[in-house]
Amino acid sequence: MPGRSALAVGAIALALVSGGIGGAVGAWSVRDSSGPVVNSLDAPKPDTQSVAAAPEGSVQAVADKVVPSVVRIEVAGRTGAGEGSGVVLSSDGLILTNNHVVAGGGQGAQLTVFFSDGSTAPATVVGADAVSDIAVIRTEGRTDLTPIELGSSENLAVGQEVVAVGSPLGLQSTVTAGIVSALNRPVSTSGDNANQASVIDAIQTDAAINPGNSGGALVDMKGRLVGINTAIATAGGQSGSIGLGFAIPVEQARRVAQELVDTGKATHAIIGVQVPSRDDAYGARVVEVVPDGPADRAGIPDNAIIVRIDDRVVTDGDSLIAAIRSRAPGDTVKITYKTPDGNETTVDVVTASDSAGR
């Protein structure tokens, strides 16, 4: 396996370097024998009772708080097997994760949850939503779990420190740290079939995220959940972290999770326009306005180019979809668009639910 070969070469190179350093030190010790010999093995063991508690706001303190609330999930089904991560929502077994984690095994797949204390429990799907890539599962027979503290992603700032906790490559309770690299990053991931795309309004982070981190926690330095780790960018044939990870903001994840718990289904905000993911226009070109939809009622015409949602710049269709889906049905947004003759207009649009026509 190429991955293992590369790892083995790295380990050998590291051992050789260490061996070279050890040889040089040993030769110096033999030549210079005039001074006293000091041996670390003879030193007394440190007083473990005097070790200071992790300072508040440190990665260690965050890990101590968050690790018990993050789980590993194994999925086994007729169409495949996989694994991911999840975060505990309730003491009686509700767990938040990604849809693509639980969907990997197909319908009827068996889910097993592994907790940080080494215990396991079977789980069933409460509800899953491919559009938002959010799912909620419930473990059986547990009433003593530690729910994660929910924070807010609305006040996040670029450069703010964050910590990711999950099970990359099955390595449970892995903790990595980084910063918020960008906000409101539209990221397109695969849906349930080739005709459906899930565009998330993502938090971008350089905290190391790898396969298996999906569904895990992105938290602030107080250990509060700010995002659900979902996707990574890769370069060429690489499949590991290159410092470009993406998380679903907790506000969106929380709203969808609550709907899944309450009804088993999720709703998504729409404005009733068709736009290409990308084209030559700087903005989202409206190729079709749905009759009597929110955009139509607000007066947005065909061929308009939407350039802003509230105070957010819209650069293409994906960024428009991400911005709208980050809102709840019934929210009012200010949409700024340009007409083909160059005139710019701002209108209020009340979003509708995509479930209205079901």
Segments predicted by a language model, with ranges:
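Interdomain regulatory linker/hinge segments that flank or connect interaction modules
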Residues: 30, 43-50, 228-271, 352-355
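Active-site loop architecture of trypsin-fold serine endopeptidases
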Residues: 78-84, 101-111, 145, 165-179, ...
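Gly/Ser-enriched beta-turn/beta-hairpin loop segments
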Residues: 79, 103-108, 116, 128-132, ...
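Active-site substrate-binding loop(s) of clan PA
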Residues: 124-126, 143-172, 248, 258, ...
